[in-house]
Swiss-Prot record:
Catalytic site: D109
One Pfam family this sequence matches: Pan_kinase
GO terms for MF: ATP binding; metal ion binding; pantothenate kinase activity
Taxonomic source organism: Bdellovibrio bacteriovorus (strain ATCC 15356 / DSM 50701 / NCIMB 9529 / HD100)
Gene: coaX
Enzyme Commission (EC) number: 2.7.1.33
UniProt protein name: Type III pantothenate kinase
Free-text cofactor note: A monovalent cation. Ammonium or potassium.
């Protein structure tokens, strides 16, 4: 079996694969100060408590946007699984042609998403929208050129900024809304977050389409923890919640 670990700004998202099929996924809050022992014990326990044998994990792939976590995570893999993990980073085979001015700046999670999307939909122009701590947009051509994208504050970051930088605005649950007009403070914040983000998705998707694909409509794929909030809005042609993990698996296979 193969264990894929996507290290985000707030969570580690783990997926356990049996060949090409994901049989288990789970999450852990990511802390830059977490020891390799804490992480290794958590991973083994989570796998075992879900009915799988940690000893059957033969390969591990790591994709991280938090560089300081990689060292301790590598140590956890070595100590608790006896595996030197594959790190998705600059210099590995991806199958993509990175058109960023500085390819080293592209986040590993954005590369993983792009690898998976081009594998799932070969020969198509793509816009990938990943709604996590940050909301990222990536444009990938049908020739597997990674063209670039946009990055905006994610829904939770926006909500936390309102709470921490104002005197009276509370923390709220982030939910899909049905009306733009709020009639109480909490509703108003929720509406602003939801429809503000929806507008961002629509506007950036439209502008990227014009700039990258000369108005020819690309396939738009949503992923990340908040992607399902916008399912009813029809802004995505497809929602693939585990896109990043699938991309890591494919990258691992390319570099075997």
């Amino acid at each position: 079996m193969i264990l894929c670990l996507d290290v985000g700004n707030t969570q580690i998202y783990a997926g356990l694969f049996d060949k090409d099929k994901m049989v288990l996924s789970f999450r852990k809050n990511s802390k830059s100060g977490a020891s390799s022992d804490e992480t290794g014990i958590f991973l083994r326990t989570a796998i075992r408590e879900n009915g799988f044998d940690p000893a059957k994990v033969k390969q591990i792939a790591i994709c991280s946007v938090v560089p300081e976590v990689i060292y301790s995570l590598r140590g956890a893999c070595m100590k608790y699984f006896n595996i030197n993990p594959f790190i998705l980073q600059a210099g590995v085979k991806t199958g993509l042609k990175i058109k960023y001015r500085n390819p080293l700046e592209v986040g590993a999670d954005r590369i993983a998403n792009s690898i998976a999307a081009t594998h799932l939909h070969p020969g198509k122009n793509l816009i990938l929208v990943d709604l996590g701590t940050a909301t990222t947009f990536c444009a990938v051509s049908k020739d597997k050129d990674y063209l670039g994208g946009s990055i905006v504050a994610g829904l939770r970051l926006c909500m936390e900024a309102l709470e921490s930088k104002t005197a009276k605005l509370p923390s709220v649950e982030i939910v899909a809304m049905h009306e733009a007009l709020g009639r109480a403070t909490i509703e108003s914040i929720q509406s602003g977050l939801y429809y503000g983000h929806l507008g961002t998705i629509k506007e950036l998707t439209e502008r990227i389409t014009k700039e990258c694909f000369q108005g020819e409509r690309p396939m738009v794929i949503g992923t990340g923890g908040f992607s399902y909030l916008f399912e009813k809005e029809k802004v995505f042609d497809e929602i693939v919640p585990d896109l990043v993990l699938k991309g890591m698996l494919i990258a691992l296979q390319h570099n075997a």
